[in-house]
Amino acid sequence: MVGNRGITHFYSSEPYGEHVSQALHCINRIVDINRTTFPISASTIQKNPYLYKEYINPVVYRDLITNIVFVGAPSTGKTTIAERLANKFNTVWMPEYGREYWEKYQVNRRLEPWQLSEIAEGHLIRENEKLLQANKYLFTDTNAITTYMFAMDYHSFAEDKLVELAKAAENRYDLVFLCSDDIPYDDTWDRSGDVHRHIFQRKIESDL
């Protein structure tokens, strides 16, 4: 029963539809019994949904993926770990969009507060796309919480949109790994030095 209504029709692509509909006292509706429209059964999809993801609604498929995020200060190994794990598990990984954005739009090595919001939004869009390409796991380098921490570190405030995205990120990931700053510092031109790395790492740890 659905509310005050009974079951009126039973839809399937299987011969057992006749027996089920009789048991339910409803009309049997056979759909695509020869599987010309969808040449696959639900039981086959269930055995390996990642192999047959083209038959699964994107909203459903995203929930089948374990999204694992790596956070930490710059030069803590997030990118290396995410990429290597993706290769090991034959899946994709989500690079830190902020790095790409910074290299393209920074002025005197700085970004404005609204640009940090754009980074968080752009990262999320790309991450959702990667979820649909992933095989069982998605390994994600950085999230909106870290972008929020950058905003607070450089500007002492974050736009409302970034605050909202950071809050949503608290419950978005299945696993969160904090990478440590106990490895040698890679002093590239886009970073703020080893001393700042340690300071920023303590802020991230405190926030967690």
Regions found by a protein language model. Name each.
Residues 74:
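The conserved Walker
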Residues 155-207:
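A glycine- and Lys/Arg-enriched "phosphate-lid" helix/loop adjacent to the NTP-binding pocket
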